[in-house]
Regions:
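Short, intrinsically disordered, charge-balanced linker/junction segments flanking boundaries
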Residues: 143-149
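Metabolite-binding pocket within alpha/beta catalytic cores that recognizes anionic/polar moieties
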Residues: 1-143
Length: 149
């Protein structure tokens, strides 16, 4: 079922957003697909909203459900705007990365603390025009959250 954000009930709000690969949304209980329009165009896929472990989760297939977007073409601004529109305050974004350290084996879970982005020529901010673009729930502070102790 597809629901326009304008017609949604507050129970579709989610506290955690997940940008992931296709198929994850199948883990959500009672998932409902929501299509959201943003000032940046549509997000990469409809957002599946459901419950996992007692929490409301919003899942978006980062590259589209049929892998419609190459990594450098993912509409990240639309993806983030859509999540903020749903009330999401925390994002989990698992991804595949490589390592030059032989002690880190394929399939192991790591939390990266460095990112080298060698791409160029794409937008990388919401603030291209002015200091305040009015993103839902936005503020100007950078927030860091401890992943694990």
């Amino acid at each position: 079922m597809l629901i326009s954000l304008d017609d949604r009930a507050s129970e579709l709000d989610a506290e955690v957003g997940v940008f992931g690969g296709s198929g994850f949304y199948e883990f959500l209980d009672d998932a409902t697909d929501v299509e959201i329009t943003t000032p940046y165009g549509p997000p990469a896929s409809p957002i599946a909203i459901g419950t996992l472990g007692g929490r409301r989760i919003a899942f978006l297939a980062r590259h589209g459900r049929r892998h419609d977007y190459a990594a450098h073409r993912v509409p990240f601004q639309a993806n983030m705007w859509a999540m903020a529109s749903l009330g999401v305050r925390s994002i989990v974004a698992p991804c595949s990365v490589g390592s030059l350290q032989p002690e880190i084996h394929p399939g192991e879970l790591v939390v990266i603390d460095q990112l080298v982005d060698r791409t160029n020529g794409r937008h990388d901010t919401f603030h291209d025009v002015g200091a305040d673009d009015g993103m839902p729930g936005s503020d100007t502070a950078v927030h860091h959250q401890t992943f694990a102790e």
